Amino acid sequence: MVMFAHTVYESSLIKKMEVMFMSYDKNMEPKNSTNMRKAVMIGCGFVGSATVFSLMQSGLFSELLLIDADRAKAEGESMDISHGIPFAKHMKVYAGDYDDITDAGIVIITAGANQKPDETRLDLVHKNIAVFKSIIPELTKRGFDGILIVVTNPVDILTYVAQKISGLPKHRVIGSGTVLDTARLKYELGEHLGVDSRSVHAFIIGEHGDSEIAVWSSANVSGINLEDYEEMSGEHHYDQSTKEIAEKVKNSAYEIIERKQATYYGVAMAIKRICEVIVRDEKSILPVSVMMDGEYGIEDVVLSMPSIVGKNGIEKKVPISLNDEEQEKLIESSNILKKILSDANI
């Protein structure tokens, strides 16, 4: 038998990762009365409607309830989407109000204002915090005890707000985080390398926004280090190509909005994926918005980090290895979000 000895550094790293591999109390599950085949969409704008359409096609749910401040809008979307049910699996898509959410397993919030050209980010934060303070107490009053998925931007800030005011265990309040950003990164890398994007493994972490971080140090193509794979493929400009791809991913939303005023299909697919891993209890690792509890020296702020997601929501936070530069950027990203929270008096 061949024995492998860990170096002192490796042993300390393993110990550190064991401490950081945070697991939530499995007893804190949704109540048995919760129907995980029933989902609620609060907000029927571009993102909400595209998501409901995607969920209708997925076959994940038997009931989809639409709620919007404009009841007629919710009714119109539910009617339009329902007419496609004969081409999908049988289910019920309907407009309703908060009294209908009591037994829902999943509530998705996409409601909120969009940032206007003359508005600061802090202006948007104040407006959408006000929206959340009007929505979440309605869920609490009706005893909602399922999983809350926050999509409204700035998603990391609003996930923090939702965790603070909902009364739900923090592992059952999930932000969509950088799930879409990570998909964009995988797509761009796949196009650059000429491989199926599903064979590319890499994460965007930190803020879902301008301070997001592409984790190049652990990026790989089917287990082959990304830089090595580029060399094998005849690419010899690794630093330049990764920088360009990271910028392209970060600016994707701006580029789309400039051309068609809004982004909604990609994020709809990202939300569908989050719902899928919850309903099917897949235990998949997704970079969702989670509360930091000392990992990487960061606490009391929500960041998008790889986490195991299943039927109970966020089941474990996965401490991926970061190099010094990536860890510094993650701390910078957390400080940016903390300042926004402080400026907004949260």
Task: Identify the meaning behind each predicted range.
Residues 55:
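Aromatic pocket-lining residues of Rossmann-like dinucleotide-binding sites
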Residues 21-36:
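A short, basic/flexible loop-to-alpha-helix module at the beginning of a structural domain
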Residues 24, 63, 67-105, 119, ...:
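Conserved N-terminal Rossmann-fold NAD(P) cofactor-binding segment
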Residues 120-186:
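Rossmann-like NAD(P)(H) cofactor-binding subdomain of soluble oxidoreductases
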Residues 48-49:
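N-terminal Rossmann-fold NAD(P) dinucleotide-binding loop
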Residues 44-45:
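Glycine-rich Rossmann-fold phosphate-binding loop(s) that bind the pyrophosphate
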Residues 166-172, 181-346:
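C-terminal substrate-binding/catalytic lobe of Rossmann-fold NAD(P)-dependent dehydrogenases
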Residues 86-147:
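Rossmann-like NAD(P)-binding element
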